[in-house]
């Protein structure tokens, strides 16, 4: 039991540390992605003067209007959120994975499905702990100073102000808008993110590629891109719902949000910011590869071993 508890803490710390570093490095891409993704909601609310023309234009415009440091706006909330989220994801994923206990050689597809299920379940459990921080990070990142030409005032002064104003206008429920569809999205994303990586790792990272950080990074990048694109429309819906807390007009449900976006903006609007999301996947790949590297150092685990 003592050994299991020690391994759990190592999983918790290794996952959280690698996540915090990677997310901070990718914070500028993350903010650009969120701005492009939610720009139509911001324009409707009068929080954005004109739409962004692409990743480059959004980056340049944000720096020009708000300063270089603004690219990290919302990152503090993201690190606070992401450390326990990713740490719990990794730690619980291994707990859930051991519950299935299928043999990879004798029952490959059951083992594969077990990896998918354990990754999804870990993500859903973790989300319930830190959703309000994800909401706060989204609102801060989309709080642009371009509501009118020449710049405008911020809607929020910081993390605490997001909580204060949201609770004042919408109550606690305002912090959890979009939670249900987020649970669906997190199961899809984490299920692919962890399940595919753990399933492909012992198959791909063998021989000369075993313990190869670059190979692990590239595999993680590919998995992160695939998982991100598969769940991206769900991510757009949940964040658009988050953006309506504090506004007069809200979506009745996630399905209503989906209908309104498709009807008024077209299907392509569900994928706005997906290009930046692919660049952001570098951070996700770094988390996966870095986590494995830390486990090699701390526990003696190997990339290709497939060990829990």
Swiss-Prot record:
It catalyses: ADP(in) + ATP(out) = ADP(out) + ATP(in). It holds the Pfam family Mito_carr. It is a multi-pass membrane protein. InterPro entries: ADT_euk_type, Mit_carrier, Mitochondrial_sb/sol_carrier, Mt_carrier_dom_sf. The keyword Nucleus does not apply. ADP:ATP antiporter that mediates import of ADP into the mitochondrial matrix for ATP synthesis, and export of ATP out to fuel the cell. Cycles between the cytoplasmic-open state (c-state) and the matrix-open state (m-state): operates by the alternating access mechanism with a single substrate-binding site intermittently exposed to either the cytosolic (c-state) or matrix (m-state) side of the inner mitochondrial membrane. Belongs to the mitochondrial carrier (TC 2.A.29) family. The transmembrane helices are not perpendicular to the plane of the membrane, but cross the membrane at an angle. At least 2 of the odd-numbered transmembrane helices exhibit a sharp kink, due to the presence of a conserved proline residue. This is ADP,ATP carrier protein. It comes from Chlamydomonas reinhardtii. The lineage of its organism: Eukaryota, Viridiplantae, Chlorophyta, core chlorophytes, Chlorophyceae.
